[in-house]
Design a protein with these regions (language model features):
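Surface-exposed peri-terminal alpha-helical interaction modules
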Residues: 1-295
Length: 295
């Protein structure tokens, strides 16, 4: 059988990639598993964890496996970093915790970006791969379950910290210590990134198999239930504080659109404090009838 030149070149290249390659700069063969880099990272084992060329049911199955395996590794790292966060909060090491929280946020945000690679797979291709996945679902992910468990521990460590400092989340946002407010915001960053990842997964499901009461995931549940999971918070008290702040918000003391604000900083008041003494800032007069609206 005659093959096109293009096919021959591709086949030859594919075979070359499956064998050790000579690096002219190092003057060594890479891929034999003998070099320090390969030994330390266990690359022979790592690169053999995916189905082989003749085992794949579709070309995109390699991408599917690589992305999911990478997600598990990142979730493992995020979980272990979160355990360190628990230790840091318990010893009041807030500077160290702040730096580590930034790392966790970047890891979790990266999870969402990685899922975008899977969006390049068309639904008909996924339906072929799906036949070989058994009843597997994201709920069975070790990394997902590890991170949820670690986050629960972090939430408890946060509560212990607030108890030691005699603070509440609501009190922190009403003029509490700046270091704790910063911590609250960074914890919320983690939570928001996590929910963003769940949303990215939801969109991936929607794009590949559809979201509807009639569409069942491999675990037998309707894909429609995924929508509710996206907004389940890791740190509920931080979100509840927003609701409480808004519930106690007062319009009085603001500025009418277009009115002069000169001199008002000296008499500025909290949006949640009792009304200002009459005359403290003349520009505040008559604002209760100002037009309402949020941006």
């Amino acid at each position: 059988m005659h093959t096109s030149p293009g096919y021959s070149f591709a086949e030859k290249l594919r075979q070359e990639l499956d064998t050790p390659l000579f690096n002219p700069l190092l003057k060594k063969w890479v891929g034999r598993g003998e070099l320090d880099y390969e030994v330390y990272l266990k690359t022979p084992q790592l690169l053999s964890l995916q189905s082989g060329e003749t085992e794949r049911v579709a070309h995109d199955e390699l991408m599917f496996q690589v992305v999911h395996q990478a997600q598990e590794l990142w979730l493992k790292l995020a979980s272990r970093e979160t355990v360190e966060l628990v230790a840091e909060l318990d010893r009041d090491a807030l500077w160290a915790a702040s730096a580590r929280l930034e790392r966790v946020v970047r890891i979790v945000r990266g999870l969402s970006s990685e899922l975008g690679v899977l969006e390049t797979m068309t639904p008909d291709t996924y339906q072929v791969i799906r036949r070989s996945l058994g009843n597997g679902s994201g709920q069975e992910s070790p990394g997902y379950n590890m991170f949820r468990k670690a986050a629960e521990g972090l939430a408890l460590a946060f509560e212990r910290l607030l108890a030691r400092r005699g603070q509440t989340v609501l009190g922190i946002y009403r003029g509490g210590p700046d270091d704790l407010k910063r911590l609250c915001e960074q914890l919320l960053d983690v939570d928001e990134a996590f929910q963003g990842w769940l949303h990215a997964h939801f969109q991936l499901v929607r794009r590949t198999i559809g979201v509807d009461r009639s569409v069942k995931a491999l675990d037998g549940l309707p894909t429609q239930v995924l929508a509710g999971r996206m907004t389940l918070p890791l740190f509920r008290s931080l979100w509840d504080a927003r609701v409480e702040l808004t519930a106690s918000w007062r319009r009085e003391g603001g500025h009418a659109p277009g009115a002069s604000r000169e001199g008002c900083m000296e008499g500025a008041m909290s949006a949640y404090a009792p009304p200002m003494v009459s005359g403290a800032c003349p520009m505040h007069a008559g604002l209760s009838s100002a037009p309402r609206g949020d941006s």
